[in-house]
Amino acid sequence: MLHLQIFHPEYDVPGVGKMIMEAGIARQNAAQAKAEGNEEEALKQTELAQKLTKDAYAKLHHDMQHFVNEATVEQLNQIKESIASCAHKAMLAGIDAIEVHGDRLLGSLCSEVLNHRSDVYGGSFENRIRYALEVVKAIKEAAPDLTIEYKLPIITLNKDGSLRGKGGLKEAEGIAFAKKLEEVGVDMIQVAQANHTGNMGDTIPPMGDVPYNWTLPVARKVKEVVSIPVATGNVQLYGTSPIGGIVSPIFPVWLVKKS
């Protein structure tokens, strides 16, 4: 099965083009130079690609931290149409399944922590999840043959009771949202840690800060309310999910013994 994650739809974000196009061209030039035996030019092009990527990431991060405006309804509609267009092209290209990245924009709109809108996309739980459901419906209409996986970001708690992550839903709302996702046609859900705090320690906390595979209990609760598969890791601990990641080198051995 060919699987594609829709992360950056085809709308213009300054800096993304530089990362993809200019840096990509530099990498191609480096490979060509190396194939021709010109190590000096290969090194030069490699360093150029690294610099272009680093500079673009730095600008994007700075702009996201300091110059973020509330998206207009027109902009949200444009993004939704672009995501649907990406899905349609993926289907035509032979892709079998896509994952909708439910963090970032969708997670921010779903989040009661980050979403301060006063229109139809803000306020109540129903309003905050409205856009994400619209995106899924648009994908289903544009690419009816695709299997849709949805990455569901859950805001969890630190040891001191503070929130870990912002761009997602708290546990109770996340479970309720999972049922809505199934109703609009999502075929599979991946339960993940919410982020969007600018701190990677939220998404990948230091060892010892949280129990190993701390999202598994939430994934289990999600699975209890939906009939579709819920993707998670280390499924041998619970036996409730038909899909899991290979989180240990002995996982294949466990599968063979279990079968």
Task: State where each predicted segment sits.
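Flavin-dependent oxidoreductase catalytic cores
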Residues: 1-259
